[in-house]
From Swiss-Prot:
Homotetramer. The gene is MEL. It comes from Lachancea cidri (Yeast). SUPFAM superfamilies: (Trans)glycosidases, Glycosyl hydrolase domain. InterPro entries: Aldolase_TIM (IPR013785), Glyco_hydro_27 (IPR002241), Glyco_hydro_27/36_CS (IPR000111), Glyco_hydro_b (IPR013780), Glyco_hydro_melibiase (IPR006215), Glycoside_hydrolase_SF (IPR017853), Melibiase_C (IPR041233). Disulfide bonds join C41-C73, C120-C150, C220-C236, C222-C229. It holds the Pfam family Melibiase_C. It is found in: Secreted. It comes from the Eukaryota. This is Alpha-galactosidase. Glycans are attached at N81, N174, N269, N369, N402, N412, N421, N426, N434.
Length: 469
């Protein structure tokens, strides 16, 4: 979240990135649900536990969505000894009870604070209280901390200053002895992608997302590839954030991930093609997959998007290499906001497979193609590492039907046996066993020197897994 009052200037210097997996957590991007984008400060015990129950019933937990993250506005301040207090009018049984209930459902409990005097909504922040607050979170059996950047008392302006402020909580969490996933939410300020992996498991890299595919907004002033944005803002569109993330993939790896912010699938009024593109692109760049929607008000088509194991398997691939944007071109069929571009993204996967996305940000459906040399741009044309023939699998071809999703949402059909269950067979093992649910449909064979061609809807994507044959 973005502060209400924020200094406008800072300078930056380079900081060397450290090795990933600083605490052994986050070897694949985190998945789960956070209440903020749909509920804001309207939080209470029933919301968290009711949502958790629904996530289990809908089969989302089985797919890997296992963190239930309580965002801002949960606190009633500090006790006489300085420790954080939960608001007992919202959480009458206390936070340890919430954690226990989630753990009983094989889910994990996430909480929120800010590296400032106050949180973004004006509640007690953790700046200067890091050791005490980390100990409190650990005593509540918390598994995850989202750590924001509001009211930071001007402690920013260079990577070193921001690093030290966020490292204080990192060290405090580690002192507790409890494994706690550490998620930075400092909006990419002070080049977080250079130093985030040294002290955390993920880091936001832009201003806050909102559910618009590419609508410009003055509150998100940086655009294009302006990854080093001095005023990150908020109300950033899907394409705005994706373009900022394009050069940052080289800084992500198992243990530390670029966080493009919560998923807006099921939030607002994006089209189905836009939601598919949003989910696909977050998945292939290895962003965390954190649902931001109201699970009780989820559309059938949105549940279908969230429930695609073939796409999730790309995100959870243990190689952990984000796809790279190979090219971007502006097109003439611009939308109502004057925006329109097409892109090719490509990247390697753990078992020798490859992922390719043709992204159509234009207003109209179009035929798009990618050359062999573009897809495999990181290999020499005659490389022995490359197979001469690849099977091409459409990762959305076996998407759950809207009718099935509607039946699951209504309770007329159980998700048991329909969804992939990562608790029984993880994605790596499923790929090794050629589980068809993780591949979609084989649509064509791609031979050396040929181009991949697909028809892509406006504001949509064609997403493929390539397998050497």
């Amino acid at each position: 979240m973005f502060p209400f009052f924020f200094a406008l200037f800072f300078s930056s210097t380079d900081v060397l990135a450290a090795s990933p997996s600083y605490n052994g957590l986050g070897l694949t991007p985190q998945m789960g649900w956070d209440n903020w984008n749909s509920f804001g400060c309207s939080v209470k015990e029933e919301l968290l536990l009711g949502t958790a129950e629904k996530i289990v019933k809908l089969g989302l937990k089985d797919l890997g969505y296992n963190y239930i993250i309580l965002d801002d506005c949960w606190s009633s301040g500090r006790s006489s000894n300085g420790s954080l207090l939960a608001d007992d009018s919202k959480f009458p049984h206390g936070m340890k009870y919430v954690a226990e209930q989630l753990h009983n459902s094989q889910l994990k409990f996430g909480m929120y604070s800010s590296a400032g005097e106050y949180t973004c909504a004006g509640y007690a922040g953790s700046l200067g209280y890091e050791d005490m607050d980390a100990a409190t979170f650990a005593s509540w059996d918390v598994d995850y901390l989202k750590y924001d950047n509001c009211y930071n008392k001007g402690e920013f302006g260079t990577p070193e200053i921001s690093y030290k402020r966020y490292k204080a909580m990192s060290d405090a969490l580690n002192k507790t002895g409890r494994p706690i996933f550490y998620s930075l939410c400092n909006w990419g300020q002070d080049l977080t992608f250079y130093w985030g992996s040294a002290i955390s498991n993920s880091w936001r890299m832009s201003g806050d997302v909102y559910p618009q595919f590419d609508r410009p907004d003055s509150r998100c002033p940086c655009s294009g590839d302006e990854y080093d944005c001095s005023y990150p803002g908020f109300h950033c569109s899907i394409m705005n954030i994706l373009n900022k993330a394009a050069p940052m993939g080289q800084n992500a790896a198992p243990g530390g991930w670029n966080d493009l912010d919560m998923l807006e699938v099921g939030v607002g009024n994006m089209s189905d093609s836009e939601e598919v593109a949003h989910f696909s692109m977050w998945a292939i760049v290895k962003s965390p997959l954190i649902i931001g929607a109201d699970i009780d008000d989820l559309k059938d088509s949105s549940l279908s998007v969230y429930s695609n194991p073939a796409v999730i398997a790309i995100n959870q691939d243990v190689l952990g290499t984000p796809a790279t944007r190979i090219w971007k071109y502006h097109v003439s069929d611009k939308d109502q906001y004057g925006e329109g571009e097409i892109q090719l993204w490509s990247g390697p996967l753990d078992n020798g497979d490859h992922v390719v996305a043709l992204l159509n940000g234009g207003n109209n459906e179009r035929s798009m193609n990618a050359s062999w040399n573009d897809i495999f741009i990181d290999y020499l044309a005659d490389s022995d590492e490359l197979s001469n023939t690849w099977g091409l699998y459409d990762l959305w071809a076996r998407r759950m039907s809207n009718a099935t999703a509607a039946s699951i949402l209504s309770g007329n059909m159980t998700s048991a046996g329909l969804n992939y269950n990562v608790t029984q067979l993880n994605y790596t093992a499923g790929i090794a066993r050629n589980d068809s649910r993780l591949f979609g449909d084989r649509v064509v064979e791609l031979s050396k020197g040929e181009s991949l061609t697909a028809t892509v809807p406006g504001h949509g994507v064609a997403l493929f897994r390539l397998r050497p044959e």
